[in-house]
Structure formats: C-alpha cells, structure tokens
A protein has these predicted regions:
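Short alpha-helical hairpin
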Residues: 1-15
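A generic short alpha-helical patch detector that favors 3-5-residue windows
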Residues: 2-6, 25, 48-49, 69, ...
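Short, well-structured alpha-helical segments
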Residues: 27-34, 52, 91-102, 203
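An active-site-proximal "capping" alpha-helix that borders the catalytic cofactor pocket
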Residues: 33, 69-83
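His-Asp-centered metal-binding catalytic motifs of divalent-metal-dependent phosphohydrolases/nucleases
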Residues: 48-65, 73, 94-104
Length: 217
C-alpha cells in the first residue's frame, strides 16, 4: 500500500475512532493539527509521511480520557499501522511521537526527540493557544466539571507530571500552568512565529476576563 493510501486509511480510522470524542480532542482537533503540521513541515528537513501519521494518530487514545494510561495510544497506533503493513521503523517512530508529544507539566522532561516530533508538537501546541485554544480549554473544563475561576486557588507553576495529570484546578489556572508557557517551548522557527499572535490574543483575553470578572463597565 502506498503512502497516500495509508494516509487515507488513517484519516478514516481516526474519524471513526474519535466520532464521539470530547470537543477539544475530536476529529476537528486532529484535522487542524494535521494541517498545521504539514504547513510547518514545509520549512523543516523531515519525513513528511511520519509527520502526517504522527499528527493524525497523536490523540488516538489520549491518556486524559483513559484513566491516565499512556500506553493505550501507542499500542492502538501500532496495531492499526501493522494492519496496513507499514514499515516497523516508521511504526516505532510514530509510537515514540505519541508517547512524547503531550505537555505533562512544566517540570516534566521529554524523553525522546526527533525533527518530526518537533513539527507535530508545535502544531499541537499551536492548536492549544489562541482563540481555538481558549475554546478548547473551557470546553474541557466544562467536560470535567471544573470551576471557571476562583481567585483563592492560585496556579501551580511548577507542577510535576503526576500533579499535572491529577489537577482539577479552575480553568483559568490552566492558562498559567500550560497555555502561556507554550510560546517559549516551540521547537521550530515557523512554530515560534505562528505562536506570537495566538499568545498575544490570550493575554488580551485574560485582561478582558479580569475586568469583566471584577464587574467593571
């Protein structure tokens, strides 16, 4: 099976698998990350086939929706790609991308690096910030039943991986614990450039949020 057909089959698989997913981690999120990754990849020396597969499968079984289990996603991707007779070397690379792409707290050190992961990670982080990022953040907060904001609960700026995974803090805290940190964690020049506008939009949003929260007119 040629690469184009594998991508086509992967799109079908992801759409079916995530048909009932939470709105911030559904097919439309995957689609945006896929497109962003392809755009960023134009300016990087990468294997585009690996980039596309990694982008499409990066949230195939997100640990947040599987009791914190980080092994289900890579395993599910391997089973699917093996069924399409994809080379094992590529499958292993995609597995490592899935295992290492997610932000897991400001104190967590990533264990694997590759140019392809850099591209996909930037794409995923871009979709976590800006207008879309704000919408996704509040959607997930509502899904988890979290408060919008509580001035008495301060953000934890140095969370460990386990603290991050277990956190049920108000949604506004997530801006400080993750979203506002991402601009400086972009891997590629293109990712950093694209992150600038989205980062500024979040800062403007927060400024307006606090004015309205305080009852200002």
């Amino acid at each position: 099976m040629n690469d184009e057909k594998v991508i086509e089959k992967t799109v079908e698989f992801v759409k079916e698998t995530l048909a009932n997913a939470e709105g911030g981690h559904d097919w439309f999120h995957i689609y945006r990350v896929w497109k962003l990754a392809r755009n960023v990849a134009q300016y990087e020396d990468v294997n585009l086939f690996v980039v596309e597969l990694g982008a499409l499968l990066h949230d195939i079984a997100d640990f947040k929706f599987h009791g914190g289990n980080e092994e289900i996603g890579p395993k599910k991707a391997r089973e699917f790609l093996t069924s399409l007779n994809v080379d094992n070397e590529i499958i292993e690379h995609v597995e490592k991308i899935i295992s290492n792409i997610s932000f897991k707290g400001s104190g967590h050190n990533q264990q694997f690096k590759s140019a392809e992961l850099d591209v996909i990670q930037d794409a995923d982080r871009l979709d976590a910030i800006g207008a879309i990022g704000i919408a996704r953040t509040f959607n997930y907060g509502g899904y988890k039943g979290r408060a919008i904001y509580n001035p008495e609960i301060k953000p934890n700026l140095n969370m460990t991986k386990e603290e991050y995974k277990k956190s049920d803090a108000p949604t506004i805290n997530h801006f400080y614990e993750k979203l506002l940190l991402l601009k400086e964690r972009m891997n590629t020049r293109t990712g950093r450039r694209m992150a600038e506008e989205r980062h500024k939009f979040m800062e403007q949003y927060l400024s307006q949020f606090y004015r309205e929260w305080g009852g200002e007119i």
